[in-house]
Amino acid sequence: MQPKIKLHYVTYQTFPSKKANTLQTIGNLKYLSKNNVDSTLIFPLRKHESSSNESTLKKVYNYEVDIKIRGISHKFPFGKTSKFERLFFLMSHFLWSRQISRSIMKKSEEGIIFFTRSEWVFYYLSKYDLKVTYECHQLSKLKKIIIPISIKKPASKIIFLNEELKIDAKIKKVYDSKIQILHNGVDEELFKTKVQKDRKRVIFSGNLSRFNTERNLDFIIQSFADPKLSDFNLSIVGANESEFALLNKNIEQLGLSERISVEKWVDREQSIKRIQKSSIGILINSENNLHSTKYTSPLKYFEYVYAGLSVVAVDFKAHRVLPNSESISFFKNNDKSNFINAILNASSSSFSSVGLNEFTLDYRAKQIIDFIKY
């Protein structure tokens, strides 16, 4: 067996959290560790509930492999107050990234590979000529300045979640060998239990809002009032307290309580069971955010497909560039008739399991290792 790669995953995310991006981070680290990578997660303790306790994170994220955990003190304002949240995030992210990068530069052992979702960590570790790979999930005006500067360093690389991110980052072609396009993936171990499917059950699973913007689930609920969908049931899984109350009120007013159920957030294992029980999975987002329309590579898509669901998705470019997108039934945003036809089309389409291995986090981890180790 080859010597273990030592990887330090440095991120401004905090743990534990119900956010999908933390599931993605832990999932990647889990399968990197399974593929002979000595992994360390380094993150700020920027919330009251933040914890670097390994047992706590293993329980929340349901993993057993060895991932070293380093929670770093966070003395900056973001996470301490709800006021000026966006400003404090930008300022605190910059200051913490500079602080941790300087600390890493002073103490870094030879042979460590760094991996990050933070553009500022990428910038500073690149500046210090350390071997670092940046996984880019979205873009901003600031990132479009920082990323092209950082990639010029010889030991710096970038993974983009889809082709649109790479195009819009406008990095010179001379650096193409240092760039990889790699979508999200699914943790196949969560699908070991077989569940009987309900052929008429449709599901939306996940956070009901993104970047403090609702995902337009009211449109989905109102569409289910149409007689053409009277044979179908809808499950919505992942509501917080206020969303749970509001959606149930709307459902009751429409007389749909027998066909539409809303559940609060459930753990990952229970969420997967509900997906497995369903036959159609919905991908929907607000059109008011560029990340949602163009850049996202949603974890739920890979879970839906791996569980054997047909997928119905709002017709955004981000969904068009997903792997196997030719099998998705698309609908125009806010077009009820189009959505209903997409559900009916998905219900009559057959699922193909060909190529499912390439949807897994194990496959993704192997691709990451091959990319970063040289």
Regions found by a protein language model. Name each.
Residues 281-283, 303-306, 310-313:
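Short hydrophobic beta-strand element within catalytic cores of glycosyltransferases
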Residues 164, 185:
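Carbohydrate-associated surface elements
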Residues 189-192, 333-334, 341-374:
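A charged, aromatic-enriched C-terminal amphipathic alpha-helix characteristic of glycosyltransferases
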Residues 205, 233-247:
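Glycosyltransferase donor-sugar binding loop
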Residues 275-294:
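Acidic donor-binding loop of glycosyltransferase active sites
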Residues 238, 246-275:
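Nucleotide-activated donor-binding/catalytic signature segment of Leloir-type glycosyltransferases, i.e.
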Residues 11-19, 37-92, 122, 239-243:
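N-terminal strand-loop element at the rim of the active site
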Residues 8-10, 159, 186, 195-224, ...:
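Conserved donor-binding/catalytic core segment of Leloir-type glycosyltransferases
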